[in-house]
């Protein structure tokens, strides 16, 4: 039996009695954001809107982005990345479960010294993948050029955020490279591994 999104009591400032709100809205009020699905346009726009709103509300208090994502689309992910860099508050990133593909990109995008992985988390990086099936030759070439541009963007961000040389990051992106939390820390994708 589906229960929907759990509801929790929340008292707005100035209210005498709490009202019931869905748990995510309550957590957003505490500046806790969640990426627990594939990265695509809807979740990207939702996270961007919440980050912008909360940064307008208080530009000095950190935001916390919890990530458990198998990855997803590159452009919506880059939009989240750009917003994380644009908003004034630091965005702390926390990997719980899996941060793969675009999930690992966003994990690495957190504020320097404020990127954390839970002890049993897994992180995976790889090169962006295109959807060329059924494409005409001309479309295929244009898609390939765009894919190469996107790969260059992702690679350079990983280099900047990890502190690793270009050749190391490029080599790791050639295939699916899975890492434990401590390996991700050694690779420069997170700064801390939580102690259980």
Swiss-Prot record:
Pfam families: CLP_protease. GO terms for molecular function: ATP-dependent peptidase activity; serine-type endopeptidase activity. It is an enzyme of class 3 (hydrolase). It catalyses: Hydrolysis of proteins to small peptides in the presence of ATP and magnesium. alpha-casein is the usual test substrate. In the absence of ATP, only oligopeptides shorter than five residues are hydrolyzed (such as succinyl-Leu-Tyr-|-NHMec, and Leu-Tyr-Leu-|-Tyr-Trp, in which cleavage of the -Tyr-|-Leu- and -Tyr-|-Trp bonds also occurs). Keywords: Chloroplast, Hydrolase, Plastid, Protease, Serine protease. Its EC number is 3.4.21.92. Coiled coil: none annotated. GO terms for cellular component: chloroplast stroma. InterPro entries: ClpP, ClpP/crotonase-like_dom_sf, ClpP/TepA, ClpP_His_AS, ClpP_Ser_AS. One of its GO terms (biological process) is proteolysis. The active site is at residues 101, 126. It is found in: Plastid, Chloroplast stroma. HAMAP family: ClpP. Belongs to the peptidase S14 family. Cleaves peptides in various proteins in a process that requires ATP hydrolysis. Has a chymotrypsin-like activity. Plays a major role in the degradation of misfolded proteins. Component of the chloroplastic Clp protease core complex. This is ATP-dependent Clp protease proteolytic subunit. It comes from Citrus sinensis (Sweet orange). The lineage of its organism: Eukaryota, Viridiplantae, Streptophyta, Embryophyta, Tracheophyta. The gene is clpP.
């Amino acid at each position: 039996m589906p229960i929907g999104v759990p509801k929790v009591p929340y008292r707005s400032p100035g209210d005498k009695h709490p009202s019931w709100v869905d748990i995510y809205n309550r957590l957003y009020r505490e500046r806790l954001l969640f990426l627990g699905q594939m990265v695509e346009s809807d979740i990207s726009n939702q996270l961007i809107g919440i980050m912008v709103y909360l940064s307008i509300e208080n530009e000095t208090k950190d935001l916390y982005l919890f990530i458990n994502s198998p990855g997803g689309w590159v452009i919506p992910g880059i939009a989240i990345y750009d917003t994380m860099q644009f908003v004034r508050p630091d965005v702390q990133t926390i990997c719980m479960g899996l941060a793969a593909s675009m999930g690992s990109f966003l994990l690495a995008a957190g504020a320097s010294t404020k990127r954390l992985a839970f002890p049993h988390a897994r992180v995976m990086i790889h090169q962006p993948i295109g959807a060329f099936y059924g494409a005409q030759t001309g479309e295929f070439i244009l898609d390939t050029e765009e894919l190469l541009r996107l790969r260059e963007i992702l690679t350079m961000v990983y280099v900047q955020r990890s502190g690793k040389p270009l050749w190391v990051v490029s080599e790791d992106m050639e295939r699916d490279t899975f890492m434990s939390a401590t390996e991700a820390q050694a690779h420069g994708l997170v700064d801390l591994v939580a102690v259980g």
